């Protein structure tokens, strides 16, 4: 099953974003190396990838590329992933989210979270039109995009987006690929932390956005992927989050590769197996996906 032509839609009507500040930043697109990297995002959007056939699985995933909260790796952590999900009959939405910036946001640590919550609201609002079951809408993120996903999985009780219909912003499940999870000094990815919270954040704020500390019995089920030799984001980020999930009796599975480093996207070069196949089996096990036979 292949993807249909994608469609890009603005995340907000007329780009009217609560808590935003008018600024002169212009979006930058870098295509060097054959991949698209976007920075200075001020007009967030969703790019919809729908399966070629009617989405009989009715499953959907919002994909959040990584980039240390300073840019977005849109190709190998976004568009390529959406196309792969389409092969399984899953509708995918690649989220181009705003990156933290004091000149454009009243609270820069809230901007990305507000965008993923708005994306969830938007998809659920159009669920019938797009052939989606809202109870099968999950989130998937890489690196700093994994931090954003883990934040959406643990901070859903407060909605920062306009939500007049009081639509739940709790994802059904989360898939986290070499994610930034913790902002605690010993395992933090300092660059992502600094971009989101500033150079010298208070311990209270670091704790709030160290999402292993925010897991509760209401946190959605999760699948984690990491490489043991990741020198950029230590594997203990995933391990601590997994332990918190287990402590709270949340359904969870974790795949730790012996090697592979950081930023490998869909394919870990150290192995012929793919983590996506394992994710699909896990989704099926937990009732979030039924193959289109």
Locate predicted features.
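C-terminal catalytic histidine-bearing segment of alpha/beta-hydrolase fold enzymes
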Residues: 235, 239-293
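N-terminal cap/lid segment of alpha/beta-hydrolase-fold proteins
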Residues: 6-55
